[in-house]
């Protein structure tokens, strides 16, 4: 049976699973869908065309599904889609997409979103991502699986942050961070491979060694980006555990529109 506090407002049209819990003074809009066993904290607002999957935990005073902070927005029915088992802590803001992009902001599964985080319109956040307190994502930002964003960091619009990368606290990021790389500073610069994170996630010593070699080619050997990519492609075909992650790094660099941190 759905547990809805008597002071909460659930507008007609909202689709709420019977196992959902909604706390005091929370507001759920008419175009919202909430999946099984999700908990909505007190005073939080879930609005817009928002879909929440199963087993999510929304902290008190969170604002989820609000209008995009884009002056071109004209009340189009753009969306926010959130997966399963996400923790979204107090005072977080997550906005719906815009028609200038795909019209949807997405958050995958098993993410840990700490207090006061902002996820802007059209962002695409993968799975198992950690966004530390007060991390701020501008519109159209992409964050790969298992990335970690330090507290008080600011990320420029359209920036891509690769899988398994890490951005240090209080950083200002204006260009893409390749997968597996640690970045920090204002403005953010590369600081090596995220070795400890890769070990924790089961990457083999050979794969980590290959990624360290890739990092040296990209950042330490004095090569131009085009020269580095030629040698990176050779490294990605060496026939070891490192082939796949190095190939993923090369593909990310090839696809960069804003350029990578250097």
From Swiss-Prot:
Stated EC number for the protein is 2.3.1.129
Q: Which PROSITE patterns match?
A: HEXAPEP_TRANSFERASES
Q: Give yes or no: UniProt keyword Repeat.
A: yes
Q: In which pathway does it act?
A: Glycolipid biosynthesis; lipid IV(A) biosynthesis; lipid IV(A) from (3R)-3-hydroxytetradecanoyl-[acyl-carrier-protein] and UDP-N-acetyl-alpha-D-glucosamine: step 1/6
Pfam families reported in the protein's UniProt record: Acetyltransf_11, Hexapep
Q: Name one GO molecular function term.
A: acyl-[acyl-carrier-protein]-UDP-N-acetylglucosamine O-acyltransferase activity
| Cited SUPFAM superfamilies | Trimeric LpxA-like enzymes (SSF51161)
Q: Which reaction does it catalyse?
A: a (3R)-hydroxyacyl-[ACP] + UDP-N-acetyl-alpha-D-glucosamine = a UDP-3-O-[(3R)-3-hydroxyacyl]-N-acetyl-alpha-D-glucosamine + holo-[ACP]
Q: Which UniProt keywords apply?
A: Acyltransferase, Cytoplasm, Lipid A biosynthesis, Lipid biosynthesis, Lipid metabolism, Repeat, Transferase
Q: Name one GO biological process term.
A: lipid A biosynthetic process
Q: Name one GO cellular component term.
A: cytoplasm
Localization annotation: Cytoplasm
Function of the protein: Involved in the biosynthesis of lipid A, a phosphorylated glycolipid that anchors the lipopolysaccharide to the outer membrane of the cell.
Q: Could you say which protein family the record assigns here?
A: Belongs to the transferase hexapeptide repeat family. LpxA subfamily.
Assembly information from the UniProt record: Homotrimer.
Full protein name? Acyl-[acyl-carrier-protein]--UDP-N-acetylglucosamine O-acyltransferase
Please report the organism this UniProt entry assigns to the protein.
Burkholderia vietnamiensis (strain G4 / LMG 22486) (Burkholderia cepacia (strain R1808))
């Amino acid at each position: 049976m759905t547990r809805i506090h008597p002071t909460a407002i659930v507008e007609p049209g909202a689709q709420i699973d019977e196992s959902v819990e909604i706390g005091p003074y929370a507001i759920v809009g008419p175009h919202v869908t909430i999946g099984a066993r999700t908990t909505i904290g007190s005073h939080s607002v879930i609005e817009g065309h928002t879909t929440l999957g199963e087993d999510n935990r929304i902290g008190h005073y969170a604002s989820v599904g609000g209008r995009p902070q884009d002056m071109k927005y004209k009340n189009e029915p753009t969306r926010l889609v959130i997966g399963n088992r996400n923790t979204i802590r107090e005072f977080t803001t997550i906005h719906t997409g815009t028609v200038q992009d795909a019209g949807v902001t997405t958050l995958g599964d098993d993410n840990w979103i700490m207090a006061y985080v902002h996820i802007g319109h059209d962002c695409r956040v993968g799975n198992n991502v950690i966004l530390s307190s007060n991390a701020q994502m501008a519109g159209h930002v992409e964050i790969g699986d298992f990335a970690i964003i330090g507290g008080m960091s600011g990320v420029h619009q359209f920036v891509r942050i690769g899988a398994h990368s890490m951005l240090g606290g209080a950083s200002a990021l204006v260009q893409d961070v390749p997968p597996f790389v640690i970045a920090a500073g204002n403005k953010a610069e590369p600081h090596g491979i995220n070795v400890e994170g890769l070990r924790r996630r089961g990457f083999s010593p050979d794969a980590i060694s290959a990624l360290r070699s890739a990092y040296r080619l990209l950042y330490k050997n004095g090569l131009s980006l085009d020269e580095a990519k030629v040698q990176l492609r050779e490294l990605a075909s060496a026939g070891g555990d490192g082939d796949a992650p190095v190939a993923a790094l090369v593909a990310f660099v090839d696809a960069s529109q804003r350029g990578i941190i250097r």
